């Protein structure tokens, strides 16, 4: 199981691409995942929840709303 930090979920790919661009421009290792008819913008694939929590805090400090998800 992996922990990922999600910063957004969009029906329109353009909106997801815009958030992904902002993340990567700020140095975050973001990626796009299409799942359940949504484009999800996520960061990381952490084996330890503590690492995901640390990344989540960095993203929140940068102004993103976040949620930790598992895969």
Language-model segments: which ranges?
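Extracytoplasmic
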Residues: 1-3, 9-71
């Amino acid at each position: 199981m992996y922990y990922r930090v999600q910063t957004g979920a969009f029906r329109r790919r353009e909106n997801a691409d815009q958030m992904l661009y902002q993340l990567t421009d700020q140095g975050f290792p973001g990626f796009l995942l299409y799942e359940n008819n949504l484009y999800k913008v996520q960061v990381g694939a952490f084996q330890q929840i503590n690492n995901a929590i640390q990344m989540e805090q960095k993203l929140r400090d940068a102004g993103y709303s976040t949620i930790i998800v598992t895969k």
